[in-house]
């Protein structure tokens, strides 16, 4: 098979092709297959041998290199190479005929340089890197670079990445010729061919016609005028025979015809005009205008067959003659000998049609194998099996992990819903249900922190997942579903790390104690509950007593009480009579939110507290000391370290409170703070950092009054609050130490005279970045530092700060003084603080 127009040799075989559209005449199977495009005789019907020669069969060419020199009759024909071209690009480029046909297609698309560059790179890589070939390799590399890569407008250069072109340029300029220097560029061009031009080639007319003609390309003829009878021109259809004209088959007249008109196989304007009537009335053709053909029968007249899904081999003359007979009285039988058609037309229309269909099936429509031109082979078809298996295993494992994670999440969500339903049932079930769920007397640190997400009525034993991310998600889901619409404080794991020698165990302890309702320990003598509030909220009450009773108790007594409370906080004692009715506990504990959380910005319902509640709490603490349970030596040592750290913090807090609060106004201010809810109108006794925090805090609302059976919100981590309070108090103490004595004493004298009067506010006005209208706001207290002023600015950045003050340096009497230190107190001008904020360029 050759597409260059040379034809097949005459010794291709002496047996007929079994898949040819028409079998040979009986007795003529052994005749030579002729490849001459023109008949030898000068008449319409010469002889049987001439007629057989004109019926060239090239669907499956006979090759002389077979075992017997020919393919025996009835043997299975091999798959033609042109069908393998559709499998992959390498199959196409491994066949010389495929390369030639593909290059012809690329020339039509003006991108033949892609294929030439690919072969140039392959040839360059095959050159052996020896001394004799060094100069040759250098010249070849320069030629490839200059022709294909240097020109940025060329199609090859446009498809290569800039980094690849830069690498090749460096290699050529530095004379570092490497056999693999063009590999990356060749790979990029090959990818472009596989993605674009190769699929278009499989869908192109030139390839489909080539497969239809059985390995002959009708678009690559040699000019018939170049020499008839030499076998260089592939056979085609006869020229259109017009009415009242005689067909000239003489080879001598062919040059004249070629000069007058285009070759017969080409579609020209003249031929279109001449055949317009016949094409328009294809079903009403004249009987005189029969179409005679020679040579190959496989070239389609109508391009309708090009885009069909299956490559069919239409016997055009036979099919057209059958269609013609439907509307005329022409004969439907074609003979291959020299006799004329003499069969009269059929009388019955139905039988006529059936015979016509059978004839069409016998004479044409030989199906060829389906060409999957729309099917793309996978790009990774050449991946090694080991690599492919490893990649497949990894992907399957990822899918399996995702599915397992989804299943676990669904199970946990179902468990959370079941626990919510179970909590409602446990509240009304009584102490018999609770006694089975509450653990017996054990140290707190032996339990997982997930107990912090349950109330006393709904606690269940679970597995500990300390550092498992999924357990963190479970805790968050439970917390959100239990307290919708409220802020979700962390269980202590995400809070700032306290400076405790055993902060890990303490964090677990605080998380475990975080959500126990405070009212359960308030009346231990009434309900029999040994889980007293002193143990659950020990750290909060330490801060509370230091804050309010530091001046009423000596230092040694405070430390002794703290020691006793810490030792009691690590025991969990549960009686069988642990619960009274739920509504009674909640109704008695409406005002039991800890006071220190009020001062730190985490208030619950602090407005209902009174001194009576504090005394009851103190009594509850003294009762809880009787239920101490000894632990292991390690637990005792750990508790002693924690106790020592807490006592140090209490000393610092008590020392600060003694210096800042006078004994005369403490009790009045205490009662005032306890009966007032958290709001912006804080007394002067509240520190500036507390007031600044209170302005930004979103108060969580909890419907205690509307629904008494609803459990309270989870309490924040007390250790985190102690640590934060200690740090801020130290900063406040340092800042207060820098102030003059008069300024430190001035804000503390006002609350002593009248504790019920609200603190005095000061107006702060400032011009921001040259704006003509100032911003005005109120700040509590008479002392405002630059750091507090910066918190008022909504836009953060690098600014210079100037404040108006009285000065005798200039005639105007006032100046704008620049303030840079955050601890500097801002000057007051006419009972206001007037400033200017200028941006630093």
UniProtKB/Swiss-Prot annotation:
It comes from the Eukaryota. Residues 248-259, 727-736 have a biased composition (Basic and acidic residues). Residues 434-508 are annotated as: Interaction with beta-catenin. Residues 1-78, 217-269, 482-527, 613-635, 727-756 are annotated as: Disordered. Residues 348-433 are annotated as: Interaction with GSK3B. GO terms for molecular function: beta-catenin binding; I-SMAD binding; identical protein binding; molecular adaptor activity; protein homodimerization activity; protein kinase binding; ubiquitin protein ligase binding. SUPFAM superfamilies: Regulator of G-protein signaling, RGS, Ubiquitin-like. One of its GO terms (biological process) is negative regulation of canonical Wnt signaling pathway. Residues 88-211 form the RGS domain. Its main location: cytoplasm. This is Axin-1. The lineage of its organism: Eukaryota, Metazoa, Chordata, Craniata, Vertebrata. The gene is AXIN1.
């Amino acid at each position: 098979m050759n597409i260059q127009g040379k034809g097949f040799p005459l010794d291709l075989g002496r047996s007929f092709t079994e898949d040819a559209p028409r079998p040979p005449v009986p007795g003529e199977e052994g005749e030579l297959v002729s490849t001459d495009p023109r008949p030898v005789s000068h008449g319409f019907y010469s002889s049987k041998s001439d007629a057989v020669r004109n019926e060239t069969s090239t669907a499956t060419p006979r090759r002389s290199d077979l075992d017997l020199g020919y393919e025996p009759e009835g043997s299975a024909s091999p798959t033609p190479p042109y069908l393998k071209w559709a499998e992959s690009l390498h199959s196409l480029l491994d066949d010389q005929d495929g390369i030639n046909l593909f290059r012809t297609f690329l020339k039509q698309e003006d991108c033949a340089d892609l294929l030439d560059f690919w072969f140039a790179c392959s040839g360059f890589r095959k050159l052996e890197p020896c001394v004799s070939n060094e100069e040759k390799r250098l010249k070849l590399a320069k030629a490839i670079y200059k022709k294909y890569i240097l020109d940025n407008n060329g199609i090859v250069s446009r498809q290569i990445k800039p980094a690849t072109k830069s690498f090749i340029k460096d290699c050529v300029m530095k004379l570092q010729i490497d056999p693999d220097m063009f590999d990356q560029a060749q790979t990029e061009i090959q990818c472009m061919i596989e993605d674009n031009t190769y699929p278009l080639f499989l869908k192109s007319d030139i390839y489909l016609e080539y497969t239809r003609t059985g390995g002959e390309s009708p678009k690559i003829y040699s000019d018939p005028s170049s020499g008839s009878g030499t076998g260089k021109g592939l056979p085609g259809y006869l020229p259109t025979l017009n009415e009242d004209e005689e067909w000239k088959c003489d080879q001598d007249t062919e040059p004249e015809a070629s000069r007058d008109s285009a070759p017969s196989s080409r579609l020209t304007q003249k031929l279109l005009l001449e055949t317009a009537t016949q094409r328009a009335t294809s079903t009403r053709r004249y009987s005189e205008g029969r179409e005679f053909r020679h040579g190959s029968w496989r070239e389609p007249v109508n391009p309708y067959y090009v885009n069909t899904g299956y490559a069919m081999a239409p016997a055009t003359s036979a099919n057209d003659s059958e269609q013609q007979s439907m509307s005329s009285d022409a004969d439907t039988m074609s003979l291959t000998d020299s006799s004329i058609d003499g069969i009269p037309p059929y009388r019955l229309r139905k039988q006529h049609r059936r015979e016509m269909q059978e004839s069409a099936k016998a004479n044409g429509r030989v199906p060829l194998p389906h060409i999957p031109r729309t099917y793309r082979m996978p790009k990774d078809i050449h991946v090694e099996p080991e690599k492919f298996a490893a990649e497949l295993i990894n992907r399957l494992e990822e899918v399996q992990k995702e599915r397992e994670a989804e299943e676990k999440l669904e199970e946990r969500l179902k468990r959370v819903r079941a626990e919510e339903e179970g909590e409602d049932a446990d509240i009304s079930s009584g102490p018999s249900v609770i006694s089975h769920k509450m653990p017996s007397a054990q140290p707190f640190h032996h339990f997982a922190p997930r107990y912090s997400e349950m109330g006393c009525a709904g606690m269940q034993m679970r597995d500990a997942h300390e550092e498992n991310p999924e357990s963190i998600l479970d805790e968050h889901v439970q917390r959100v579903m239990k307290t919708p619409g409220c802020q979700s404080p962390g269980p202590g794991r995400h809070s700032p790390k306290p400076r405790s020698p055993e902060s890990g165990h303490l964090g677990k302890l605080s998380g475990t104690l975080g959500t126990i309702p405070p009212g359960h320990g308030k009346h231990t003598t009434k309900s029999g509950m040994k889980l007293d509030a002193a143990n659950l909220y020990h750290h909060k009450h330490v801060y509370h007593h230091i804050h309010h009773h530091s001046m009423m108790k000596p230092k040694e007594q405070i430390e002794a009480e703290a020691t006793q409370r810490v030792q009691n906080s690590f025991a969990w004692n549960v009686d069988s009579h642990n619960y009274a009715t739920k509504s009674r506990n909640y109704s008695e504990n409406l005002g039991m939110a800890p006071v220190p959380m009020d001062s730190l910005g985490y208030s619950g319902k602090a407005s209902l507290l009174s001194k009576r509640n504090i005394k009851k709490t103190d009594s509850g603490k003294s009762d809880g000391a009787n239920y101490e349970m000894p632990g292991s030596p390690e637990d005792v040592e750990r508790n002693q370290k924690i106790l020592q750290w807490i006592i140090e913090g209490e000393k610092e807090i008590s020392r600060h409170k003694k210096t800042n609060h006078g004994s005369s106004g403490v009790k009045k201010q205490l009662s005032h703070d306890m009966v007032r809810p958290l709001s912006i109108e804080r007394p002067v006794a509240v520190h500036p950092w507390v007031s600044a925090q209170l302005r930004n805090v979103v108060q969580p609302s909890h419907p205690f009054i509307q629904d008494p059976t609803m459990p309270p919100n989870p309490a924040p981590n007390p250790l985190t609050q102690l640590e934060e309070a200690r740090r801020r108090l130290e900063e406040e103490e340092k800042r207060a130490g820098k102030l003059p004595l008069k300024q430190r004493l001035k804000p503390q004298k006002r609350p002593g005279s009248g504790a019920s009067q609200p603190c005095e506010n000061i107006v702060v006005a400032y011009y921001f970045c040259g704006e003509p209208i100032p911003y005005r706001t109120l700040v509590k207290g008479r002392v405002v530092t630059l750091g507090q002023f910066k918190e008022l600015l909504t836009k953060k950045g690098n600014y210079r700060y100037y404040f108006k003050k009285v000065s005798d340096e200039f005639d105007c009497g006032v100046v704008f003084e620049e303030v840079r230190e955050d601890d500097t107190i801002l000057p007051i001008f006419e009972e206001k603080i007037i400033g200017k904020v200028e941006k630093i360029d």
